[in-house]
Design a protein with these regions (language model features):
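Charged, often Cys/His-bearing segments associated with DNA-binding zinc-finger transcription factors
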Residues: 1-40, 44-48, 78, 82-220
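Short conserved beta-strand segments at catalytic cores or DNA/RNA-binding microdomains
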Residues: 50-66, 76, 84-88
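Short, solvent-exposed beta-strand edge segments and adjacent coil->beta transition regions
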Residues: 66-67, 97
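Short glycine-enriched, charge-decorated loop/helix-capping segments at active-site entrances
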Residues: 73
Length: 220
């Protein structure tokens, strides 16, 4: 915006994030939450809210693709179960994990046991606690923290969660998790995917037809 000579107050940008980040995560969720490896890595990292540490539960597959996330004021079996339940919600049977790797926190074991009992997780799902297997998610935490650090603390859990939703969905797009739905390469394809999700610009069909016409015209 600054390069275009447009001055926008930081509070305006903050309000945009709070309004649109959760909506963007909701509208794009179907696109970036597809094609996971059946081996999931679960872990939590710390996020400061009003001067106190909260817990950001996160899951990635063994390739490092983002599966889901959940911000909680507590680190407990209840929070772990809520996070895992959220990650599993909406997945077909064949999309659910065959293996879950966690740290040695007892909360995960309790949550996994309850979800199996409730039929939300296959009873054959293996629970591992192999430290080096979580290197991939610990590295991913670090990349996310680079984005969070300039914020210098959040004022409330809802505002923190809204901002993190924006960070997570944009990182998922940059990882290429929605690439099959991007009709154009690179950032332009990601931008158009977001625009289509909000009903901005041509539809996917119109865009695809336009690209084909351009291709044939260039080849003529």
């Amino acid at each position: 915006l600054a390069q275009r000579g447009i001055t926008v107050d930081h509070t305006t940008i903050y309000r945009w994030v709070q309004c649109y980040a959760p909506e963007m995560e909701k509208r794009l969720r179907w696109f970036w939450r597809r094609g996971f490896d059946p081996s999931w890595r679960l872990d939590e990292t710390y996020v400061k809210v009003r001067g106190k540490w909260t817990y950001l539960y996160r899951a990635v597959d063994k390739r490092g693709d983002t599966i889901d996330f959940y911000l909680s004021p507590t680190r407990s079996a209840k929070a772990a179960k809520r996070f895992l339940g959220k990650a599993l919600r909406g997945l077909k049977h064949w999309e659910k994990p065959a293996t879950l790797n966690t740290d040695k926190a007892p909360s995960y074991g309790a949550a996994i046991t309850e979800l199996k009992r409730e039929g939300k997780l296959d009873r054959e799902t293996a629970h591992r606690q192999v430290k080096y297997l979580n290197n991939v998610i610990e590295a991913d935490h670090g990349k996310l923290k680079i984005l969070i650090k300039p914020v210098r603390g959040f004022k409330s859990i809802p505002t923190a969660y809204a901002t993190i939703k924006g960070f997570e969905v944009m990182r998922a797009l940059r990882k290429g998790q929605a690439r099959p739905w991007c009709l154009q390469p690179g950032i332009r394809g990601e931008v158009r995917l977001v625009e289509r999700a909000f009903g901005i610009g041509p539809s996917a069909l119109t865009e695809a037809m336009g690209m084909l016409n351009h291709h044939f015209a260039a080849a003529a």
